[in-house]
Amino acid sequence: MERINRLRAQVGASAASPPPPGGSADVFVSLRDASCPQHVYDAVLSPAALEFVAELAAAFQPQVEQLHARRQARRLETEQHGAMPHFLEEMRAIREDETWRIDPQPRALMDRRVDIGDVSPANRELLLRALNSGAQGVQVDFDDGHCPTWNNTIKGHFNVLQAARGLLEVSGQQVVENPALLVIRPRAWNMDESHMLVNGRVVPGALFDFAMHLFHNGKHLFETEMGPFLYLPKLEGYTEAALWRQIFEYTEKMLDLPHGCIKATVLIENIFAVFEMDEILYELRHHSSGLNCGMWDYTASIVVNFRKRPECLLPDRQQYVSMKSDFLRYYMDLLILTCKRRHAPATTGMVPFVLSELPTGISQAEAIEKATSSKGVEALAGSDGALVYDLALVEPVATVFTEKREKIGKAGRSAPLVFDEAFFAEKLLTLPRGDVTLKSVEMNVRVALLYVLHWLYGNGTVVVNGCIEDSATAEISRAQLWQWVYHRVPIADASQRVDAALIAEMLRKVLHEESKRKPHQPQYLEAARQLVFLISTMRFPPAFITTFLQDQEALVESLQH
C-alpha cells in the first residue's frame, strides 16, 4: 500500500486539499415558494444547515471550477482533435497492483440484491411505499428521476429528513420497523442550485444535496447503522472521484463522523469513466460501496461525445441496443471484473417496467419473465443486484439473485474474464450496426417530448409504453435524434432521410396524439415541442438535457403564471 501511495503522489492522482474553513461567507437564498409550507422551508433551510452548505461550497469552489474546466477541455479535445478514451498509462501501476482492496462493507450493505430506482424525494407517497417495499434500498433520486424546482428540492429534503427518522407518514401509513435503506443520489455536477449563492457564485446542486442530507441526517443514520449511503452520478473520471473523497473526508471531520462512514456507489454512466474504474475505486477505497451500470446515460455519453463520427453512429436503440450488445455486455463484464478484483459490490441497471401501465399485448407475467430473465443473465455474470422501478418486481428480482447466488455457491463461478486492456478497449468502442426506421424516430421523439413536457410540469419521470422514462432515456433519445439529423441517416422503411422536417412532422404527430389521450394546457405542449425541436437540431447541442432544461427556468415560471 505504501508503494501505491508513493505512485499516487508521483502522478498527482488527487486534487489539491481544500482550504481550511475561515471567514464568513456571503449567502443568498431564494424566498419560499407560496406552495411550500413554512415549517418545511424552515426545517430544511435552518441557519445552521445553510451555514454548513455555504462552508462546503466555499471550501470546494476552486476544485469544482477545475472539474468543469477539465470537462470542457476534454470535450474540446474530443471534438476538434479526435481524442478517444483509453486506459491511462500513468495509472497503470494502480490498475496492475492486485494487492489493494476497498474497505469491507458495513453490515447494512452486505445484501444489495434490489434497490428501488428513480424515486424522487418530492414524491412523498412513492418514497414511503418504496421504504416499505421489502427492497434492500431506495435510490432517493435528486438526479435523473427528479425535477429540481426549488419547491421540489426543499420538499424532497424535508421528506428525507423525516424518512431517516421513521417519521414519514401518508394517509395513516407509516414507515415499517425495518425499512429499506435510504441511498441518496445527489444531483450530478452539471446541475446547479440556482436558488442559493455563496460569495456571488451559484452552489453546485451536488454539494447542496449532499450537504443538506449529511447535515440533517448523517449522524443519525450512522448511529442507527443505516447510513449515510450515496449513489454518485455521472462521474467522468478518477479526478472527480478524488474530489468526492475530499468532500467526504472534510464533511466527516466537520460533523464529527468516523472516517470512512460515508459509503458511495459510483454510477458508471460515462464512456471516459469506464476506462478509469480501478482508479475510481482506489480514490474512494475507504468510502466505496461499489460500482453500478447506468446503461442509457452511458450510451448517451458515447453519442454525445462522438456524435459527428460516422463510426459512432448508433442505430435504432429499441432493436439493436441492449445489455446483449457487445459494447454494453463488455462494459458490464469489465465493471463486474473490476469490482471482483477489488472486493467491491457490483450492481446492474434498472428494470423500467410499470406493470399497471403495460401496453396492449404484453401481460404482466410476460413483463416479469422478461425482467427476471435479463437479471438472471446479469446475476450469472457476477452482478450482486439491480434496481427496479415497480415495487411488485422486488420479490421476483430478489429471488433471481438469491437463486443465482446459491447456484454459483454450489457449482463455483465460471472462469473469470482476464483483464486484457487491448481487448476491452476495442470492444467498448465497437458499436452495433443496424438501421433506423420511422418507428424508431417516432419513439425517440415521443420519449423526449413527453419527458420535456412533464419536466415543465415539475416532474422528473413519465411512463411511456409501460416503461418509466427519466432523464437518462430522454438523454439518449434527444442525442440520437441530433445525430441522425446531422448524418442525414436513411430510413429503412421509407424513401427519405432523417432531417429537421421529419423531426418537426413527428413532433406534431406525437403532440396531437398526446393532446387526444390526456388534457394539457396548450402553452405547455407548444413549449415542449419547441424545446425538443431546438435540442434536436441546434448547432452545438448541450452535454446534458437537464442542463438545457434548467436554463429554461424563466420559461417554466412564465408558463406557470
Regions found by a protein language model. Name each.
Residues 1-32:
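Intrinsically disordered, low-structural-confidence terminal and linker regions
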